[in-house]
Amino acid sequence: ASVTVGYSDAVTGARQIKLLGLSGIYTQMLDENRPSMRGLAAPFGLSYVPGQWLESIQVSKGLSSVNNGAESITGQINMEYRKPTDEKPLFLNASVMNDTKTDFNIASSLQMGEKWSTVLLGHVSGNFRTFDHNHDGFMDDPEMFQVNVANRWLYYGPTGVQVRFGLRALQDMRKGGQSGYDHKKYTLSSTSPWGSDIVNRQLNTYVKVGVPISADNAKNIAFVADYTLTDMNLRAGASKYL
């Protein structure tokens, strides 16, 4: 297959996409045509997009348009979320996998009159038990707990003016390495289990405004603004980073 997803780091659980054989830094990730998963958000970006939140995914292989940035070398992957105008007013999903990963999702679309609509999205997931199937002393997948919430709004005016804006907040905690690792007790001279602790907090907000400039709405002018704040704290062994 030309699109694959793999672990780049089994200790932290970071994942990356390979498109046409090249790693994820050459693939542009888009959130409804807005560039996403940049900088500190890149290693765990895929983990912060619950599958049940998505309506569709579009994959464009090869050199793509530079309208949304110039980092697309092997292609673009655009994710379309559930819309405020979704016909399903309430969606609930829960799953427990055989590796004890638990996953809960909710999506609720609300119509606030003829012009306004909104969608509320919620996600809670976690790995609550360690496992080491290959018996190498290291956890095959890190313990993790994630809370992810989002609220998206749509205004559609009678003249064709559209305003879309939203807010998303998440907290992700991961503990990898050897089972029993505690950064408060670990020292370089000790024989205590080695591991890593990661706490990642992220806040994202955006606004998109489209104004038609022709009678048939075939032409329009748009304004897009996006802001992401990422706060990551990492402890690996006795060292603290970021």
Locate the predicted segments by residue.
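Extracytoplasmic beta-strand/coil segments of soluble accessory domains associated
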Residues: 1-35
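Short beta-strands and strand-coil junctions in structured, solvent-facing domains, enriched
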Residues: 4, 26, 36-37, 63-67, ...
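Short loop/turn motifs that connect adjacent beta-strands in outer-membrane beta-barrel proteins
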Residues: 68, 84-89, 113-115, 158-162, ...
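Predominantly transmembrane beta-strands of Gram-negative outer membrane beta-barrel pores used
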Residues: 28, 56-60, 76-82, 89-98, ...
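Transmembrane beta-barrel architecture of outer-membrane proteins
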Residues: 14, 44, 54, 72-74, ...
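N-terminal periplasmic accessory domains that precede
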Residues: 1, 15-18, 30, 44-50, ...
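Short acidic/polar hinge/loop motifs at secondary-structure boundaries
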Residues: 34-61, 149
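Flexible loop and strand-edge segments within Gram-negative outer membrane beta-barrel domains
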Residues: 127-148, 154-221, 227-242
